[in-house]
Amino acid sequence: MNINTKLLHAYPVICRETGASSIPKFQASTFHQSDVFKHEGYQYTRFGNPTITAVEECIKSLEDASYGLAFSSGVAAINAVLFLLSSGDHLVLGKNIYGGTYQTVHEFLIRFGIECTFVDESHVSAWEAAIQPNTKMFYLETPSNPLLTITDLEAVTKIAKTHQLLVACDNTFMTPLGQETLPLGIDIVIHSGTKFINGHSDVIAGLIATNDEALYQQLKIHQKALGGILAVEEGWLLLRGVKTMGLRMEKSILNAQTMAEYLQQKPQIKQVYYPGLATHRGYETHQKQAKNGGAVLSFELASEEHVHQLFENCQLPIVAVSLGGVESILSLPWCMSHASMPEEERLKMGVTPTLVRLSCGIEDIEDLIADFEQALQS
């Protein structure tokens, strides 16, 4: 089944009870039990809800996985995975990671007695060199946020399996449409459903898919006990938004590729980071494991003055945290997505005051380029 057909038909999209053309919002906190001594079906929305079940079936289908789980945010999904670790365990993860993941590591994992080592994710040998006797998990994010650094999924996963380690991967930037991670040996794939999967900047959601039943059961406990269940309203909106993901992504990816090529030619731009460019350091690896360059790019401006000029004069993109909406979103990671990181750590990973991230929407590309042209020339 091809992707746009799959997005419309490969999971519950019609209400079985009524034939309604969309899954209803089961806006209920609790469910009547016909037999108090035999608990069957739904009981309490924190434990499960028909609308949320449809969302979980959706991500399971999109990832061709055995199990799916929905959470209240991408961070809730990330935390559910990282909390598989126990005191005394060791975690290896890339140094170029999402700021929320970094915060969980430093605010919780280290305090809970879990050792963490950050490595240069683009060097396969760095992952193996970091393994200790108590290492339990590799945590990957490729392309990374915000520098679009590439990790060789197959090679790193092969190392992990040799040492009987779990491998989790944040696949938010590429989506299940652009990068299939589970077939490469990844144990758990994570998405911020807030981003491209929903695609309309009106939902906060996290999603997980896995083929391992034991991991699924443990993550299900985390979902329930940590209280990170997706709200019914959010789930219903996500089910609506995901139907157009194929069409949205096709346009956004084309816009990102064109914008990256345009920005490369501008004297005000020192560097463009986009894995769809042949000049990108991880281009060959990315081409091997992904279907396209994605819809997010970052670029380094020549000076902070140019940064102020761009943000003051750009008119079409909204200026905001997050990404993946139908509208283009411009952000400054230094004081937005990665602001919680110490300045020294931000600079070490390459997040500078002149690094700008652009999530491309579905606008006409001629208008986006014209807007950037006038902003850069102002």
Language model regions located:
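N-terminal glycine-rich, Lys/His-bearing helix-loop that initiates the first secondary-structure elements
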Residues: M1-Y42
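Conserved PLP-enzyme active-site core in the AAT-like
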Residues: L7, Y67-K266
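Glycine-rich phosphate/pyrophosphate-binding loop
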Residues: K25-F26, S34-A54, C58-S61, I329-T354
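Conserved N-terminal alpha-helix of the aminotransferase class I/II PLP-enzyme fold
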Residues: T30-A76, F83-L84, G100-E107
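Glycine-centered tight turns that cap/initiate beta-strands
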Residues: D64, Q268-Q271, T354
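PLP-dependent enzyme catalytic core of the Aspartate aminotransferase-like
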Residues: H106, E115, A129, P133, ...
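Short, well-ordered beta-strand elements within core beta-sheets of diverse protein domains
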Residues: L238-L247, G294-A302, R357-G361
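Conserved small-domain helix->loop->beta segment predominantly found in fold-type I
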Residues: Q257-Q315, V319-G324, M341-L347
